Amino acid sequence: MAYPFQLGLQDASSPIMEELTNFHDHTLMIVFLISSLVLYIISSMLTTKMTHTSTMDAQEVETIWTVLPAVILILIALPSLRILYMMDEINNPVLTVKTMGHQWYWSYEYTDYESLCFDSYMVPTNDLKPGELRLLEVDNRVVLPMELPIRMLISSEDVLHSWAVPSLGLKTDAIPGRLNQATLTSNRPGLFYGQCSEICGSNHSFMPIVLEMVPLKHFENWSTSMI
C-alpha cells in the first residue's frame, strides 16, 4: 500500500507489477540521459562564445538526430509492447470473479460458485477499529487464493468507474454495457488496497477496494463458510 509522502511506486506484489516497475526504471533512465544531454547543450550555448555563423548545413548531424531518436523510441516501445501483451494474456484461470461498479460501492460475484456474491462498502470513519485505514477499509473484503491466475470481469451498473489495485498492477475501466477483463496473480499473501480511479460522482473518493490474498486451503475454507 502507499504511505504518506511516498515518492516511488508501491511494492510490486504480482509478476505484472514487477515488469511495470522495471519498465518504469528503464524508461526513466533514458529520459534522464536525454535531459542531461539537452541541459549540457543549452549550458554550452549560453557560456561559450564559439559559434559557426557561416555553417549552412550539417548532414552528419542531421542524420544523427534523426536516427538516434528512432532507436530510442524502439528501445522504449519493444518492452512496452511485451508488457502490454502479458497484461492481456489469460491462461487457464482457476477462478473468475465478476466485479460491478455502482454509485458508490462495488459488488462481487464468484461465478464458479452458485450463491457466492456480496456488496462491498467503505467503512465510515466513525466505525473504524484501531489499526484500520481511513477511507480504505471495506465491510466485505474480496478473498482470493494467492499464487494462482485469477480472471476479473469488470463492468458497471450506472456510470464509468475504474477498478484499480496499484500494487498488483491493475487498472481496468468499468463501463456500463461493456464487460472488460483483467488477470491477477499475487506473489504473496496479504491485504492489497485500491480505489475507484475514474471520477464517478460526489462520492467517488469513497469507493475503496480491498483484496485479501490467502493460501488456497484458507480460501477453500472461507468459500465454504460463505455459501
UniProtKB/Swiss-Prot annotation:
Keywords: Copper, Electron transport, Magnesium, Membrane, Metal-binding, Mitochondrion, Mitochondrion inner membrane, Respiratory chain, Translocase, Transmembrane, Transmembrane helix, Transport. GO terms for biological process: ATP synthesis coupled electron transport. It is a multi-pass membrane protein. The chain crosses the membrane at residues 15-45, 60-87. Cu cation A2 binds at C196, E198, C200, H204. Its cofactor is Cu cation. Component of the cytochrome c oxidase, the last enzyme in the mitochondrial electron transport chain which drives oxidative phosphorylation. The respiratory chain contains 3 multisubunit complexes succinate dehydrogenase (complex II, CII), ubiquinol-cytochrome c oxidoreductase (cytochrome b-c1 complex, complex III, CIII) and cytochrome c oxidase (complex IV, CIV), that cooperate to transfer electrons derived from NADH and succinate to molecular oxygen, creating an electrochemical gradient over the inner membrane that drives transmembrane transport and the ATP synthase. Pfam families: COX2, COX2_TM. It catalyses: 4 Fe(II)-[cytochrome c] + O2 + 8 H(+)(in) = 4 Fe(III)-[cytochrome c] + 2 H2O + 4 H(+)(out). PANTHER family: CYTOCHROME C OXIDASE SUBUNIT 2, CYTOCHROME C OXIDASE, SUBUNIT II. The keyword Ligase does not apply. Cu cation A1 binds at H161, C196, C200, M207. It comes from Lophuromys flavopunctatus. Gene3D superfamilies: 1.10.287.90, Cupredoxins - blue copper proteins. NCBIfam families: CoxB. Belongs to the cytochrome c oxidase subunit 2 family. Residues 1-14, 88-227 are mitochondrial intermembrane. Mg(2+) binds at E198. This is Cytochrome c oxidase subunit 2. Its EC number is 7.1.1.9.
